Every structure is written in structure tokens, then in C-alpha cells.
Amino acid sequence: MSNEKSPFIVEGKLADNERLKRESNNLRGTITTDLKDDLTGGFTADNFQLIRFHGMYQQDDRDIRAERAKQKLEPLHNVMLRARLPGGVITPDQWLAIDKFADDHTMYGSIRLTTRQTFQFHGVLKPQIKLMHQTLNKVGIDSIATAGDVNRNVLCTSNPVESELHLHAYEWAKKISEHLLPKTRAYAEIWLDGEKVETTEKPVEPILGDNYLPRKFKTTVVIPPQNDVDVHANDLNFVAIAENGQLVGFNVLVGGGLAMTHGDKSTYPRKASDFGFIPLENTLDVAAAVVTTQRDWGNRVNRKNAKTKYTLERVGVDNFKAEVEKRAGVTFQESRPYEFTDRGDRFGWVEGIDGKYHLTVFIENGRILDYPGKTLKTGCAEIAKIHKGDFRLTANQNLIIAGVPPQDKDKIEALAREHGLIAPSISNQRLDSMACVALPTCPLAMAEAERYLPDAVTELEGLLAKHGLEEDSVIFRVTGCPNGCGRAMLSEVGLVGKGPGKYNLHLGGNREGTRIPRMYRENISEQEIMAELDTLLGQWAKERDSGEAFGDYVVRAGVVKPVVDSARDFYDQ
């Protein structure tokens, strides 16, 4: 962190995480000692937090926690790993390695696609952790900085028809990811048995600083009119601006984020602020300048107010922007015009301008596993064995089989149909619904999300049919806690877990992902949620304007007031 004192630095006793990072020897801690300790399946003290910087969270199976306690056993500790995949691109060889590891070395045998456009392994026991990292490394994948107080996996819009434009945007996503990565060799030393370099010179993190960032930091590259990455959920966004099909620069949006804390009104979701346009050559400098400004000015005293969105509100958008311009040596130009029209994935076949085809398949909740009559995991592996292109994971937790030559299209489609990757009929509502993992593995979950969503959607489908709305849908998202991984705070109907079987019901976001929904009912049951939606969907069916989306209707009809400036009006009723 810079030694220069700024009036925008928060004074006070630092959060304990700051001590932890400072004393970690650049993220090494005593992780190697914990790995050798077979008396516990978990990591102790600081290492519990430090493994996050290596892409892992310690978890346990909460379904069996009480039973193990009765037997005087510790929780069944295991780790979840989140891979680093800028833009979500995986080769067939990588897919087959991931598939085999999930089968052979995880408790659940699944591959979980996530809203961060990557995959997660769940249920990896301590003896398998090093093997996991080495297996991924052999096929060119790592999990550096996919969690912790760093810049995390960089997202990029998936599967636009303009495949050349996507390629350029994807290359920038990779460059940004590499530029902002931690420079410590801790990951290679611990997991890959890398050589330890002895030096008297203290390791330096030129961008992140040796205390790293105050809090997690998320970055996207987005290609309008698709907003599949949900720009307003992220700290830093590069909105691609093209001229004659060629990428010429980015509009930069800073300070989005959805996490909040129940009962703490100093926390709230926030949309990202528009800083302006930059040409391509300024991209990495601006990315570093935003990160270092947040590094130096972010709140290291109170972690609940440590994210970039709170820094912007505290210091002022203009001051933050001016500091970024100063550090990057640029002046933001006026933003170039663009429009978001949709966030959903384009299911089915899409032909790119290069003559190759992309098949997007729906993966409910992103959970790739073999089910009775729907062998998704086997199907993906069989496709990987013959596929000459690549796979692309989407930020909506779906899968794209990309770059298929015309002569292979029929073979790929036949395999996809055989294994249930292409279903005979999936409702628009199911396609527009999403949930985070939540129970049983996430330690933060207050309520079900992934396991509740399929039944909730079935009920919602029934309500839509009851009111003659079978062809319509609402953007419906469920998140098991207010940290917001399911991005419910950018949905038309959002459920935020409050306790077992209880949720806060939020209404009034829009389909484009540019309006935050307001809380309509607090701490209500699943039955009460559906009763409320039954009434509101009936009103929508009778009173909507032509083509009016549900989120727009509930705002126009006065069911909820729109959230205009969330820092000041999110909690208004």
C-alpha cells in the first residue's frame, strides 16, 4: 500500500484479516504444515482464510453435521475449489481431466458451473487437495486468486454472433486477469512443489500490495447488447465499444456489487458508476489504477464496508475517478453509446461469422451430474472426446459447445440429445431462473437455493399457466444468503435466504439487469412467496401494457417504488 497519506484513508483499528494478510509471508502462512496434519480434515487459524487466496473455501456437509457431532466427530471438512478461467473457456482435453477428477476424487462426483463463469469442485478431502491442483496444472488450469481479497476470475460475454469481436474481448479478459494476478510464488511452491527462491529482498506485489486488497474485487468484459455477466454486480467493468465490427475501446463502469448484511443498513447493493470511454491502449493502466485506488482508499477497518462500491460512496465518484485518471495518466472521454437488451443465453445453435457453430445447452443450476434419464456428465465427456472446438461456460451457469465445424454439427447434436443436454421442452421460466449453491456445502447459507429452485420454478410455471402467461417468464433468482452469489439483487423476482425455509422477497428489477429490486416482503415462507406471486402475476396478466415485463409492471403499478439511488433509498418502503 502507498505510504502517502490521503484524507480518504479510513483510520482506526484494522480488521483482523489485515493482520492475517500482513503476516502471511505473501499468502504462504503455514498451509504446508496443515496439509501434513492428519488429525483434522480442516485448516486451522489463519490458514482457514489463506487458502481462499489459492482458490479454495473450507466447507463441510451440513446435512450430516449434527449426526457427526452426536458421534463425537468433527464436521466432515472438505474444500471447494473454484478454477481461474478468464472468459470461461475450456478445451476438450481440459474438460476430460476435470471430469475424471470429479469422478475419482470428490465426494459429490459433480462439476458445478457458477455465476463467475467458471467451474467448482465440491467435496475434496484434504489428502486429495494437492493432487487436485497438480491435475489442473497439467492441463493448464489454476485457481490462483479466485477467492480472497484480490481481483477474481475475469468474466467475458459468451457466444455473441460476432465471433471475431468476442475473440478480441476474450483476449483482453485474459490480459486483465494476468495483469492483476498476485505475483507471489506461494501457489506454485505449496501445490506444485515449485522451487522456493531464497532472497533477502522482500517480495513485492506491485499492484495488489503486500496487504492485498481490502476486500474481494470482481471484473468483467461485456459485449453489448448482451449483459450476461451482469455488469452491476461487479467492481470494474469494461463495456466493449466496436466500430465496423472491430473493438476500439471500452466504456469503464466502476463500483457495482450486490452483497449486503441482513439488519445492517450501512450495507446495500449498488449499480456501477460510468467513468467514461478509453481506447484499448489504456486498458491495463486503467485496470491497475482502479485496483490500486481501491487498495489505498478502501476501508480496512470495517470489512462490511470494504468493497469498492462503499469507497465510491464515501469519497465521491468524482474524486475516485480523478485519482484513477491521475494514476493511469489518462483522461476519460465521454462514454460511447451502447444498449443492453438481454441477459439470457442464446440456447440452441448459433452460427458465427467464421462459419462455425455454437450450441448452448441449459444446465439447471449449473450442476453437471448424471441423473436418471439425463446423463449430463457422461454426455459432456462423450462430446469432449470428439469435439474439435472448445467449451465456454456462461455467467448464467450454462454450457456452450463452441467452434463446431459444419460437418460435426449432427454428431454433436445427436450426443447432446442422447444424454439429455438438449431436452424436448424447457419453459422460458426455467431458462430465466438461477440459484447459488447454498446448502448443504456453503457455510454461509441461511436457506436452500440450488435444491429449492427446481420445485420453486415448477410452482411458478403453474402460476404463469393459471393466468395465461405460459409463454412469458420473469427473471427469477434465489440466493441462500445476502452475499448474493445468485445475483438475486438484479432480478425481477429475487429471493434472499433469511433462515430455514424463509426468504426476503424482492421485486422490481428489470430484464436488462439495470435496476435493483426492492424488498416487498420480509422473512416469509415458501408458501407465502407463491401466494404473493399468484396475486401479482394475476394482476400483471390483466393490467400490463403490451409487452410490459413483470419488473416494469410492478414499478409502474406502484407495487414497489423503484430503487433509484441505492445508497440512499434501498431501504425505503
From Swiss-Prot:
Q: Binding positions for [4Fe-4S] cluster?
A: C436, C442, C481, C485
Q: Which organism is it from?
A: Alteromonas mediterranea (strain DSM 17117 / CIP 110805 / LMG 28347 / Deep ecotype)
Question: Which Gene3D superfamilies does the record match to this protein?
Answer: Sulfite Reductase Hemoprotein, domain 1
Which is one Gene Ontology cellular component term of this protein? Answer: sulfite reductase complex (NADPH)
Q: What's the encoding gene here? A: cysI
To which protein family does this belong?
Answer: Belongs to the nitrite and sulfite reductase 4Fe-4S domain family.
Residues bound to siroheme:
C485
The EC number on file is: 1.8.1.2
Cofactor binding summary note = Binds 1 siroheme per subunit. Binds 1 [4Fe-4S] cluster per subunit.
The top of its lineage is: Bacteria, Pseudomonadati, Pseudomonadota, Gammaproteobacteria, Alteromonadales
Q: Which PANTHER family match?
A: SULFITE REDUCTASE [NADPH] SUBUNIT BETA (PTHR11493:SF47), SULFITE REDUCTASE [NADPH] SUBUNIT BETA-RELATED (PTHR11493)
Name the needed cofactors. siroheme; [4Fe-4S] cluster
Task: Please list the GO terms describing molecular function.
Answer: 4 iron, 4 sulfur cluster binding; heme binding; metal ion binding; NADP binding; sulfite reductase (ferredoxin) activity; sulfite reductase (NADPH) activity
The record's keywords, sorted A to Z, are: 4Fe-4S, Amino-acid biosynthesis, Cysteine biosynthesis, Heme, Iron, Iron-sulfur, Metal-binding, NADP, Oxidoreductase
**GO BP term, example:** sulfate assimilation
* General function of this protein: Component of the sulfite reductase complex that catalyzes the 6-electron reduction of sulfite to sulfide. This is one of several activities required for the biosynthesis of L-cysteine from sulfate.
Which reactions is this enzyme annotated as catalysing?
A: hydrogen sulfide + 3 NADP(+) + 3 H2O = sulfite + 3 NADPH + 4 H(+)
Q: Is Cell inner membrane set as a keyword in this record?
A: no
Q: Which InterPro entries match?
A: CysI, NiRdtase/SiRdtase_haem-b_fer, Nit/Sulf_reduc_fer-like_dom_sf, NO2/SO3_Rdtase_4Fe4S_dom, NO2/SO3_Rdtase_4Fe4S_prot, NO2/SO3_Rdtase_4Fe4S_sf, NO2/SO3_Rdtase_FeS/sirohaem_BS
Named in its record, the pathway it takes part in is:
Sulfur metabolism; hydrogen sulfide biosynthesis; hydrogen sulfide from sulfite (NADPH route): step 1/1
The protein, known as: Sulfite reductase [NADPH] hemoprotein beta-component
The record's subunit annotation is:
Alpha(8)-beta(8). The alpha component is a flavoprotein, the beta component is a hemoprotein.
One matching Pfam family: NIR_SIR_ferr
Q: Does the keyword Cytoplasm apply?
A: no
